[in-house]
Each structure stands twice: as C-alpha cells, then as structure tokens.
Regions:
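Active/ligand-binding-proximal structured segments within catalytic/core domains
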Residues: 1-34
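Charge-rich, well-structured scaffold segments of protease-associated domains
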Residues: 27-210
Length: 210
C-alpha cells in the first residue's frame, strides 16, 4: 500500500531483488559492478522520462548492453546456494497489500549462520541483474491477467476502495509501470521502509532462542 503511485508494483519487485545478494554475496568484484549498476539506474530514469519511441529504443539498447556486461561480474543465485549450503529448504517470499514475507526452513544448528546472511542481505540491497528479473515479473503479471479469480478480485477491490491503494493499485503493478521501472524509487523505498521498526522475525521449531 506504500508503493509510489507512479511506480506501482515496486514493493513486489524489491522482494525479487532481495534474492540477488549484497555487496559481499553475489559478485566477483563489487567495486566494478556498482559502477555498471549505477549507469543502468541512470539510464532507466532517462528512459522513463522519454516518450519518443526511437529514442527509447536506443536507451533500452544501452541498458541491455550494460546489463550484459554487469551480469558477467555477478554470481547468479548465490543467495540461494548459500542457503542450500546450510541445509535450508523452502526459500521463498511473497508480497501482499500490507507486508512482504520472506520464508526459510533452516536446520536448528544453522540459525547463527542464517542470521549472519540475513543481517548482510537486508541492509545491503543491490539491484543486481535488475534488467533480466523484469522477465520473471512480467511472467507473473501475465499469469495474473489470465487468472479469472485475480481479475475479479482486482475489480472488487477497486470498487470497495476507490480512494485507497488497496483499490487504486495492485501488488504486482500495472503493465505501464513494469515497462518503465525506477531503480531509484526502489532504493528510496527500501531505505525508508526496510528499517528495524518495520520488521520482525518469527521463528518456530526445535532450537534454543538463548
């Protein structure tokens, strides 16, 4: 409900990006990679403000080329591999109207290592492989548009909450906004809302909390 009106679906996209690692995890050379990521972010801001189709195509080609170069520095799926290495299963997440939940099933003797990875992951957001992740988000959007239940729910929420984000925007966002993403807005949203007083950790199972 707190996603900016001009970039709906932002919270859900951020959820995806938090599986891409951190400054330490998911890269072979963070200093080089962050330069390329900043170039991509800057180009997306220009892209969003450009209406001329030929100019947009040229900018997108630049984004595509730099994204490819940046992908050579990144280590894909390293977060997932780090969780598998400690015996974790069920790595997942979902975004709803009021919260985003991240889920792991971890061995009781790996709680400390799990916490160490999370303590690095959440504050050190890296919008790594941002360009290619759009494809996964588009696919989710397409699946939702083909789902009658979801379509009915969107219409119902729009009727019930005509002046509230519950009804004026959807969790996954509009096609227009997905086609014109803002890495800058995602970073700012993360800095504002992914803070200790907005987060909680719920744990259950055979472990010693002390």
């Amino acid at each position: 409900k707190n996603a900016p009106a001009e970039t709906t679906g932002l919270a859900h996209y951020l959820e995806h990006m938090l599986f891409k690692g951190s400054h330490q995890l998911g890269t072979t050379d963070w200093e080089r990679e962050r330069v390329e990521i900043q170039k991509i972010e800057n180009l997306y801001e220009v892209y969003r403000q450009t209406s001329d189709s030929s100019r947009r195509a040229a900018i997108y080609h630049q984004i595509d080329s730099i994204s490819y170069a940046a992908s050579k520095i990144a280590i894909a799926n390293e977060y997932d591999k780090s969780m598998t290495a400690i015996g974790s299963t069920g790595t997942n997440a979902f975004t709803s109207n009021d919260f985003t939940m991240y889920v792991e099933n971890i061995p009781s003797n790996q709680v400390e290592q799990w916490a160490r990875v999370q303590g690095d992951r959440f504050p050190n957001l890296v919008l790594r492989l941002f360009h290619t992740e759009l494809e996964a988000v588009y696919e989710e959007k397409n699946i939702g548009m083909a789902n009658d239940g979801r379509r009915v729910n969107e219409v119902m929420m729009a009727a019930l909450f005509p002046h509230h984000p519950y009804g004026t925007q959807t969790t996954i966002g509009t096609i227009e906004h997905l086609k014109n993403p803002s890495m800058k807005n995602i970073r700012e949203y993360h800095a504002k809302y992914y803070v200790p007083n907005n987060m909680c950790v719920a744990m259950a199972g055979d472990f010693n909390p002390d």
